[in-house]
Amino acid sequence: MASLRDIKSRITSTKKTSQITKAMQMVSAAKLNRAETNAKSFAPYMDKIQEVVFNVGKGAKNAKHPMLVSREVKKTAYLVITSDRGLAGAFNSSVLRNAYRTIQERHQSKDEYTVIAIGRVGRDFFKKREMPILSELVGLGDEVTFAQIKDLTRQTVQMFIDGAFDELHLVYNHFVSAISQEVTEKKVLPLTDFGTSGGKRTASYEFEPDEEEVLEVLLPQYAESLIYGALLDSKASEHAARMTAMKNATDNAKELIDSLSLSYNRARQAAITQEITEIVGGAAALE
């Protein structure tokens, strides 16, 4: 049995740890609130640009923009979104496990795919396994602005247009609620499906100067918005996962403290009983 000093030391250290995890839980809750607000605020813009792109794309019968045309898939790019830090439960491991399994199942060689890594955890994961990384972005912070990822998104879209890869898939954690996040894979390029408009145009447009030039500007913005929206979604998921992980850690610490306190009291009671027994035994020996 551990000594009273050892048990007391463990109780003290566990209490200090629980104070840290409790503080991290509260910080993550505040960050989650802001991240969720940012994601929800971006949703109306995303819905509107999707509607406009759908209507313009359906109306421009003669448009042959490369972002709208499916081609033979020789190489697929996977844009994988993770965090820069850990202590977020299964947030990173679940999305990386899904991305890794998908790549292994779909591709026979490294020439058939490439990875675009957002987040230090994901970047390090793919580097460790010597998987091809086309580009990376780390150190974004807790509140991401479009300006921070503008270069990456534009380069990614341009590389697709230039033929560096033939499909682009997003792999990230979709925010469902504070206690639930779902790993999501979404094909971004080529833009062959504009969502839930039922295949019917909801508006018609007159193009000036023509539909080709309108799509030349609109389609890259739409693809970039899809990536940015997924990143906002992932950030909310990250803070939710970290808040949940820290809450679980705090609860576990409390249970451990209760268990250690019980062990401490039992050990102390046993020590007192032993001392009383020795005193009584010594007194009896003197009689």
From Swiss-Prot:
One of its GO terms (cellular component) is plasma membrane. Gene3D superfamilies: 3.40.1380.10, ATP synthase, gamma subunit, helix hairpin domain (1.10.287.80). GO terms for molecular function: ATP binding; proton-transporting ATP synthase activity, rotational mechanism. InterPro entries: ATP_synth_F1_ATPase_gsu, ATP_synth_F1_gsu, ATP_synth_F1_gsu_CS. Disulfide bonds: none annotated. Keywords: ATP synthesis, Cell membrane, CF(1), Hydrogen ion transport, Ion transport, Membrane, Transport. Pfam families: ATP-synt (PF00231). Belongs to the ATPase gamma chain family. Produces ATP from ADP in the presence of a proton gradient across the membrane. The gamma chain is believed to be important in regulating ATPase activity and the flow of protons through the CF(0) complex. This is ATP synthase gamma chain.
